[in-house]
């Protein structure tokens, strides 16, 4: 089984991924795939370089480029595990790539929704090199994500979790969701 975790930047996807990992489920991060490709091309890991490589990959390999690069990592993990989590799928093209590459696998989409103002504050506090520091940067990044088609992936989710509460409550919701998914599938 493949579990795709999607949501806007800063929504709380990594909390879900970590909860699956606590239960022994390995993961592949789509963002890490792009960062690895950026490093392979000899570029410094800046927001600009990662964005350029992301665009270049899609020009070279198509809109599902990152998924194509992630397929072998997922395949390798599925050889040793019944369940694999993919973090950060952004388009239905990418979902389709995984469905085509793994026709016998059940694929489940889990989406996280978090209000924009909460995501902005989290991203500012997180401090990753590519996180926005102004509301304008934040909105620009959101529009880029939406242009990739992330809203379509969220709309097709099998499970939706809302992260609009204190951290402890969200952690409880995540634990319940992960337990439910693993029990039902």
UniProtKB/Swiss-Prot annotation:
Pfam families: AAA_17 (PF13207). Keywords: ATP-binding, Nucleotide-binding. It comes from the Archaea. GO terms for molecular function: ATP binding. ATP binds at residues 7-14. The keyword Lyase does not apply. Belongs to the UPF0200 family. This is UPF0200 protein TON_1344. The lineage of its organism: Archaea, Methanobacteriati, Methanobacteriota, Thermococci, Thermococcales.
């Amino acid at each position: 089984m493949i579990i795709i975790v999607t949501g806007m930047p800063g929504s709380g996807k990594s909390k879900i991924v970590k909860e699956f990992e606590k239960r022994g489920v390995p993961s592949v991060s789509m963002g890490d795939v792009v960062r690895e490709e950026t490093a392979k091309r000899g570029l410094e890991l800046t927001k600009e370089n990662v964005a350029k490589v992301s665009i270049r990959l899609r020009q070279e390999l198509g809109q599902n480029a990152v998924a194509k690069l992630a397929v072998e990592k997922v395949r390798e993990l599925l050889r040793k595990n019944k369940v694999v989590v993919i973090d950060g799928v952004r388009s239905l093209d990418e979902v389709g790539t995984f469905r085509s590459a793994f026709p016998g696998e059940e694929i489940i989409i889990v989406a996280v929704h978090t209000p924009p103002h909460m995501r902005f504050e989290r991203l500012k506090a997180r401090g990753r090199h590519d996180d926005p520091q102004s509301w304008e940067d934040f909105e620009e990044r959101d529009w880029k994500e939406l242009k990739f088609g992330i809203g379509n992936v969220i709309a097709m989710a099998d499970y939706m979790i809302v992260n609009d509460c204190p951290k402890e409550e969200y952690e409880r919701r995540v634990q319940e969701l992960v337990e439910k998914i693993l029990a039902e599938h």
